[in-house]
């Protein structure tokens, strides 16, 4: 068998199929771009759906790829079995109506066994086929030459997920020998395709030749397809003679680096530690690539998966004796292993590390307390009759300590316990309900949904000119009912065509007027929203009666529309500038386009520096002043992506999309309204940059007249400050302020020195009144001071005065009670503790406090009780002495 690295195996696979006329397709992002049904890309074929369903015709009907994939449905098995992973690579070759069984089966055999390629021992290869698939059997036996006892017929070898394309499949297995098995040689599961560790599945070839009809019948597909998948990690484990995937060159460098970070732990020393090493190695691969592709930790969706993986890895780091954040330190190792085919981890290494480290540090704050609570919860559950961790306890771990439910479930399972999932879900539901009530009842179109869903009439939004549009009124909704005439106060209208933009994609709706054919104002448009069937709904205040079927003149508020166009184009410029300054890992996380300002949310872990903000603003304004034409193209999503358009994560695109291009600086999918040229924006001014959540920042900016107003307002403020500080010109204001600040600091220093002298004099008076309480000397008094700081300063003076063994000082400040108690070593040796004394006294003046044995302080609401509190302390001093 050849000695090959994982990189060589990957490249060899792609080269083999390239030689057989295949187009090598780069791995798609782990984040699905055009499939809202998927959380992650989880296989090679997941990226081929558009070709197999006919929605897109590929340039080459033969395709091969090595696809990054994430699956977390069996996450609890990662580390405990030889093959389970959350992140893996799927090598695949695909035929879209081109070749079929007579080509793909011999190719698979050639790649696996030819000395030019992998050179595996043919005697160790077995295949499974569907019993009725005589063609596949013939190819394996008569053409390839596999003996009958190496071909297993299995009813399960039929790929079918319900309605749609389906067909038989053929799986290829490698015999690792009985010495690597986990069942006896005579076990009924000891065969290729059975539940055993001896026969390792390395390749699955699906022959998609039938169509499963709704009536349950199967008919031949006119165009037959091939879909294959070979797990890179599995085949590499065979090539490198590794007992599991984790002993290959894809994982071992990560495990070795983890050993260095651990408390002297070594891989292969004991089973429990090995599980932890494997989990860490797998999870750091998954999160590194997911973050490189644009995902960030959060409390929902794929962000929750990332958070769960990072925290699961950190928990296993604890088991290896690793203290604090550590997973981020393994990212460079991942990048080094994968860089030959996937440079993105190396390219974005600093950002990926920062994201992981931030998430780890957040978890570390509560990790220790959470683990202690988890141990206590498990101990209590073991004593219970039903051996179950309550849903309430599981939710507390989640809500207070950041432990995902799945981590609690795994810990409980390891301890032989169950978790009350229903109870957990009920707690979660109750919390969401509390949050909903706190937000209040938001207005929605929900009450109209039934009526609106039944409206099928077509309505077209017309981009472009803002001239008046003549349109027919085709539907009127009043009080959730369809009517033929509206003459009340409010109504919702649908026209056969409209120039009014409906709110979408962060851009708010157009406003305007509706006139009758005589030019009379009949209604004011106050909002426009999308109906369930995508018509534009015009919410109007009625002036004169409106009738269904009549022609009306629709007039958009041009000033408002201009503001919206300018600000929307500005958001595209801002997005591109942010990516240029902060890096291409920066993505849009939300936006709001209003006529008088814009708001843009973007992914970033840190606040922008003043220099970065200024640089972004400069780049945007340069593009505005370059007078660049804004080009809009209507096309299909695939063509748009090839044009370089940015697709927003989570957005679903239809068969046609609008691509907005600003030269080669910005290209985005966008359905909003835009300028014809960037110079129409005038200028942009960033008003603020702030945080809106973990990993998300927000910029608020103004353009055009609003930007001019913002600058002139600030100029007026500057002039007022200039007059106030008596600067001769605006450029001198900062120097003048610095000079005034210096004078102020000098004056404050003088005042503090004078105050210290006064306090010292007060201390002299106070410290002369010394009482003898049994074997200790005591100074106890109420002082005339301005605050607790003054009391503490008096106590500091007392320490160096050697006037007494005990100091009790009290003061009333702004209607509040304050007390300080200090003890010297003699008083402490006599059995006194300042913290205990203050806790006895504080309730008397309506407060609480604490401190160290030699110094304590307290505050309260009832200064009238200070005299009695001092007396109580003196009593305690007398009684508590040894």
From Swiss-Prot:
Tagged with keyword Protein biosynthesis: yes
GO molecular function annotations of the record: alanine-tRNA ligase activity; aminoacyl-tRNA deacylase activity; ATP binding; catalytic activity, acting on a protein; transferase activity; tRNA binding; zinc ion binding
Any Pfam family matching the protein: tRNA-synt_2c
Location(s) in or outside the cell: Cytoplasm
Reactions it catalyzes: tRNA(Ala) + L-alanine + ATP = L-alanyl-tRNA(Ala) + AMP + diphosphate
One record GO biological process: alanyl-tRNA aminoacylation
Cystines in this chain: none
InterPro entries the record matches: aa-tRNA-synth_II/BPL/LPL, Ala-tRNA-lgiase_IIc, Ala-tRNA-ligase_IIc_anticod-bd, Ala-tRNA-synth_IIc_core, Ala-tRNA-synth_IIc_N, Ala-tRNA_ligase, Ala_tRNA_ligase_euk/bac, DHHA1_dom
Main subcellular localisation: cytoplasm
Alphabetized UniProt keyword annotations: Aminoacyl-tRNA synthetase, ATP-binding, Cytoplasm, Ligase, Metal-binding, Nucleotide-binding, Protein biosynthesis, RNA-binding, tRNA-binding, Zinc
GO CC annotations, alphabetized: cytosol
Cofactor(s), names only, from the UniProt record: Zn(2+)
Uppermost EC category: ligase
Superkingdom classification of source: Bacteria
Cofactor info, note text: Binds 1 zinc ion per subunit.
EC number(s) reported in the record: 6.1.1.7
Binding annotation for Zn(2+): 568, 572, 670, 674
Xref: NCBIfam families: alaS
Protein purpose: Catalyzes the attachment of alanine to tRNA(Ala) in a two-step reaction: alanine is first activated by ATP to form Ala-AMP and then transferred to the acceptor end of tRNA(Ala). Also edits incorrectly charged Ser-tRNA(Ala) and Gly-tRNA(Ala) via its editing domain.
Family: Belongs to the class-II aminoacyl-tRNA synthetase family.
Domain comment in the entry: Consists of three domains; the N-terminal catalytic domain, the editing domain and the C-terminal C-Ala domain. The editing domain removes incorrectly charged amino acids, while the C-Ala domain, along with tRNA(Ala), serves as a bridge to cooperatively bring together the editing and aminoacylation centers thus stimulating deacylation of misacylated tRNAs.
Protein name: Alanine--tRNA ligase
Organism: Lactobacillus gasseri (strain ATCC 33323 / DSM 20243 / BCRC 14619 / CIP 102991 / JCM 1131 / KCTC 3163 / NCIMB 11718 / NCTC 13722 / AM63)
Name of the gene this protein is made from: alaS
